[in-house]
Design a protein with these regions (language model features):
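Catalytic Walker B motif of ABC-type/P-loop ATPase nucleotide-binding domains
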Residues: 161-164
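Conserved catalytic motifs of ABC-family nucleotide-binding domains
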Residues: 157
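Conserved ABC ATPase signature
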Residues: 136-146
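ABC ATPase NBD coupling module
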Residues: 68-85
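Short coil-to-helix segment of the ABC ATPase nucleotide-binding domain corresponding to the Q-loop/switch region
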Residues: 97-105
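Conserved ABC nucleotide-binding domain
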Residues: 124-138
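Helix-to-loop junction immediately C-terminal to a conserved catalytic motif
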Residues: 51
Length: 229
């Protein structure tokens, strides 16, 4: 089976405050895995490294057969736009833009044909239950905004979706519905899913649970580092 993700001997230093070492991590295409661990253990750092939002100090990170480490920022941006979907706790949607425009921007970043942007965005949003595609996302409910964020993550049919604490701000009912949506969307898109969460109840949803403690991480008490959660 071909791999969606491969990490080998990856090491990341955040100054003198924090370090993370991943000797090996592989995720197959279509596989769904949970990164589990407490706050500050390095779950978010791992996802940011894979996405190219942080640069590893050493080691190799390969997404869909393309190396993310050691490439230019523009090359990393291209690989991310084409192969990686992102769903974070904070959606980073453009509030004054419509749902359709927010999703279309992902297609534009991936270099998809411009004349297909609107129709592809609208079709996927409708499929995910968003009918008001021309309304600014600031006027949508939290649950609807989550659906827009998921649509943006999968519209380019990525190889892998990275979800960083995607339900942390939701109550139990909405959290369950959000994860149902994310996992179903990934299945239909044929995308692998790597989700980071401190919620142990999430483990039953995944065929594979990876404890971040199985990696080597160190942090000094009283320090803080960008994406460590």
């Amino acid at each position: 089976m071909s791999h969606a993700l491969q990490l080998a001997n990856v090491h990341f230093d955040y100054g003198e405050d924090f370090s993370l070492t991943i000797t090996e991590l592989t995720l197959n295409k279509g596989e769904m895995a949970l990164i589990s661990g407490g706050s500050g253990s390095g779950k978010s750092t791992l996802l940011w490294l894979i996405a190219g939002l942080l640069r590893a100090t050493s080691g190799s990170i390969t997404v869909a057969g393309e190396r993310m480490d050691g490439v230019s920022e523009s090359a990393a941006d291209r690989i991310r736009a084409r192969h990686i979907g992102l769903v974070f706790q904070t959606h980073h949607l453009l509030p004054e833009f419509s749902a359709q425009d927010n999703v279309s921007l992902a297609l534009m970043a991936a270099g998809e044909p411009e004349n297909t942007h609107a129709s592809r965005a609208r079709e996927l949003l409708n499929k995910l239950g968003i009918e008001r595609v021309h309304v600014p996302v600031a006027n949508l409910s939290v649950g609807q905004q989550q659906r827009v964020a998921v649509a943006r993550a999968i519209v380019c049919k990525p190889t892998i979706v990275l979800a960083d604490e995607p339900t942390a701000s939701l109550d139990q009912v909405n959290a369950s519905q959000a994860m149902d949506l994310i996992q179903q969307a990934c299945r239909e898109a044929g995308a692998a899913l790597l989700c980071a969460s401190h919620d142990r109840a999430m483990q039953s949803r995944f065929e594979r649970v990876i404890q971040v403690d199985s990696f080597v991480s160190t942090a000094r008490a009283g320090t803080k580092s960008g994406a460590r959660a």
